[in-house]
Amino acid sequence: MRAARLMGALLALAGLLQLALSLRIAAFNIRTFGETKMSNATLSNYIVRILSRYDIALIQEVRDSHLTAVGKLLNELNQDDPNNYHHVVSEPLGRSTYKERYLFVFRPDQVSVLDSYLYDDGCEPCGNDTFNREPSVVKFSSPSTQVKEFAIVPLHAAPSDAAAEIDSLYDVYLNVRQKWDLEDIMLMGDFNAGCSYVTTSHWSSIRLRESPPFQWLIPDTADTTVSSTHCAYDRIVVAGPLLQRAVVPDSAAPFDFQAAFGLSEQTALAISDHYPVEVTLKRA
């Protein structure tokens, strides 16, 4: 019995060591993330617990015109150490008065931001732009991982245009490659890539799915939703040989925070109707 307990403790320690020697990245659509949600102590506590799992986290559906909620989030993430997390946030994006931001929070002792830009998807007032919320792309330096530099392309796709927007991520990928002479690119977010928004018949016309450079890490069979639906809306796609080799096998998955924290469905849905999707990169 004592030997079995010792073996269990050693395995647990090995798991913690492996986690410490890796870089964990996530995309999380926090439904209607703003002042109301961050003013709720229970919800904000769970959000901070979830985000604290990650070295880089992309947050979507940020509805925070004055960045008050973002400031509260950073204060709570940095409660013990003011340098735990830094952030990069986009301008408000959207074709109508409804706007959202993309927000990246990251650990500066693990990665640093080398550059960022808002992808130019055409003339919005003219009605010929491609995305409802065009990607705000960030290039990271990661000295301690096998891949030293990589870009993250975020997308919260409009449900009614999901297939077309996912296809157009191929053009964003080409633009990032040309702009930064960089092959290692991660595309992630709430693509609405499942159920009625993207069906089996759509996939053959989506270049991001059909082209050889891309590996889709979250499968069509995954469930990234909190409610009783079973939809693989949230995805992580990687391109580039170094980045693809750096992915820890089988590390990409939704994080079911409802089960992890023992929450009721009501409480879980108050946090978000999506689970984060996450992936781990190997250390050098």
UniProtKB/Swiss-Prot annotation:
Reaction(s) this enzyme catalyzes, per UniProt: Endonucleolytic cleavage to 5'-phosphodinucleotide and 5'-phosphooligonucleotide end-products
Subcellular location: Secreted; Zymogen granule; Nucleus envelope
Obligatory cofactor(s): Ca(2+); Mg(2+)
Disulfide topology: 123-126, 195-231
Cellular component GO terms, alphabetical: extracellular region; nuclear envelope; nucleus; zymogen granule
Cofactor note: Divalent metal cations. Prefers Ca(2+) or Mg(2+).
Site (Involved in actin-binding): 35, 89
InterPro entries, alphabetized: Deoxyribonuclease-1_AS (IPR018057), DNase_I (IPR016202), DNASE_I_2 (IPR033125), Endo/exonu/phosph_ase_sf (IPR036691), Endo/exonuclease/phosphatase (IPR005135)
Keyword terms, alphabetized: Actin-binding, Apoptosis, Calcium, Cytoplasmic vesicle, Disulfide bond, Endonuclease, Glycoprotein, Hydrolase, Nuclease, Nucleus, Secreted, Signal
E.C. numbers: 3.1.21.1
CDD domains on file: DNase1
Signal sequence range: 1-22
One example of a Gene Ontology biological process annotation: DNA catabolic process
Active site: 100, 156
Family: Belongs to the DNase I family.
Record-linked PANTHER family: DEOXYRIBONUCLEASE (PTHR11371), DEOXYRIBONUCLEASE-1 (PTHR11371:SF27)
General function of this protein: Serum endocuclease secreted into body fluids by a wide variety of exocrine and endocrine organs. Expressed by non-hematopoietic tissues and preferentially cleaves protein-free DNA. Among other functions, seems to be involved in cell death by apoptosis. Binds specifically to G-actin and blocks actin polymerization. Together with DNASE1L3, plays a key role in degrading neutrophil extracellular traps (NETs). NETs are mainly composed of DNA fibers and are released by neutrophils to bind pathogens during inflammation.
Name of the protein in question: Deoxyribonuclease-1
